[in-house]
């Protein structure tokens, strides 16, 4: 028995069909019913119902490094946009390293709407009110004070990193700090603002040409040309 129709938009947790049905795609079995794991569209292929993930939606996993924007200040933490199917939740206890009296200290003292954070995904539980829990209690995480955030399609993140980190190491030849979030947000911080603009353009080029052979060498050549132009004062 099916609970969906062709081209229907489904969200994580939505019931797709009963266990005796043929279902494919990112789904899970719960009490005799298939439920969707992702935001996707339903397709019927002969006698099989298929959930097709919508490209660009980040699918969080425990341990992922993500870059998010604070979208709301709650009573005991913050709501954070991580480009997923639902906002993530950053509890006070996972953000601060000391006790805070919430009755006398407003949370906006630490993080406010619009702030950018680099965080780790601590847990993912689709049965919770906030399925995605974040933490700042890890290395290389915390509030981002400056720099540039570039957004790409999450599925292109491995290309920006490259095999054994080859592409990322190439990008870092400019001497900038770069943090790649698994949710498709990339933070870049350089001493020279022009370098940030240049790196942002390279990252978008990698996204657009991820299928091209020899892309790492081409990006390295562009960086060398850029360095030469800076030395000559033509940038």
Swiss-Prot record:
> Which PROSITE patterns does the annotation name?
S1 (PS50126)
As recorded in Swiss-Prot or TrEMBL, the protein's gene is named: rrp4
The record lists the organism as Pyrobaculum aerophilum (strain ATCC 51768 / DSM 7523 / JCM 9630 / CIP 104966 / NBRC 100827 / IM2)
Gene Ontology MF terms: poly(A) binding; RNA binding
Q: Signal peptide position in this chain?
A: none
Q: Which residues form the S1 motif domain?
A: 63-137
Q: What does the subunit comment say?
A: Component of the archaeal exosome complex. Forms a trimer of Rrp4 and/or Csl4 subunits. The trimer associates with a hexameric ring-like arrangement composed of 3 Rrp41-Rrp42 heterodimers.
Give the residue spans that cross the bilayer: none
For biological process, the GO terms are: CUT catabolic process; exonucleolytic trimming to generate mature 3'-end of 5.8S rRNA from tricistronic rRNA transcript (SSU-rRNA, 5.8S rRNA, LSU-rRNA); poly(A)-dependent snoRNA 3'-end processing; RNA catabolic process; U4 snRNA 3'-end processing
**Cysteine pairs bridged by disulfides in the record:** none
Checking InterPro entries in the record gives: Exosome_RNA_bind1/RRP40/RRP4, KH_dom_type_1, KH_dom_type_1_sf, NA-bd_OB-fold, Rrp4, RRP4_N, RRP4_S1, S1_domain
Q: Name one GO cellular component term.
A: cytoplasm
Could you identify this protein by its name?
A: Exosome complex component Rrp4
State the function annotated in the UniProt record: Non-catalytic component of the exosome, which is a complex involved in RNA degradation. Increases the RNA binding and the efficiency of RNA degradation. Confers strong poly(A) specificity to the exosome.
The family line of this record is: Belongs to the RRP4 family.
Which coarse location class applies to the principal site listed for this UniProt protein?
A: cytoplasm
Which compartment or compartments is the protein found in? Cytoplasm
Domain KH intervals: 147-203
- Lineage, top-rank taxon, reads Archaea
Keyword Transmembrane carried by entry: no
Q: Which UniProt keywords apply?
A: Cytoplasm, Exosome, RNA-binding
Q: Does the keyword Cytoplasm apply?
A: yes
Q: What positions belong to coiled-coil segments? A: none
């Amino acid at each position: 028995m099916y609970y969906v129709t062709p081209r229907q938009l489904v969200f994580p947790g939505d019931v797709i069909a009963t266990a005796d049905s043929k279902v494919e795609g990112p789904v899970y079995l719960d009490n005799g019913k298939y439920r969707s794991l992702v935001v996707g569209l339903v397709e019927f292929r002969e006698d099989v119902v298929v959930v097709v993930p919508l490209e660009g939606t980040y699918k969080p996993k425990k341990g992922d490094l993500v870059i998010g924007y604070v979208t709301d200040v709650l009573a005991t933490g913050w709501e954070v946009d991580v480009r997923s199917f639902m906002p993530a939740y950053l509890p006070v206890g996972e953000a601060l390293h000391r006790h805070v009296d919430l009755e006398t200290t407003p949370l906006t003292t630490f993080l406010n709407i619009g702030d950018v954070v680099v965080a780790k995904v601590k847990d993912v539980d689709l049965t919770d009110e906030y399925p995605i829990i974040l933490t700042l209690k890890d290395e290389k995480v915390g509030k981002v004070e400056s720099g540039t955030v570039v957004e790409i399609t999450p599925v292109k993140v491995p290309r920006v990193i490259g095999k054994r980190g080859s592409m990322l190491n190439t990008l870092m030849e400019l001497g900038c700090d770069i943090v790649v979030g698994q949710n498709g947000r990339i933070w870049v911080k350089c001493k020279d603002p022009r370098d940030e603009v240049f790196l942002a353009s390279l990252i978008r080029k990698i996204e657009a040409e991820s299928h091209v052979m020899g892309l790492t060498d081409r990006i390295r050549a562009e960086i060398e040309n850029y360095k030469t132009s800076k030395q000559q004062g033509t940038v």
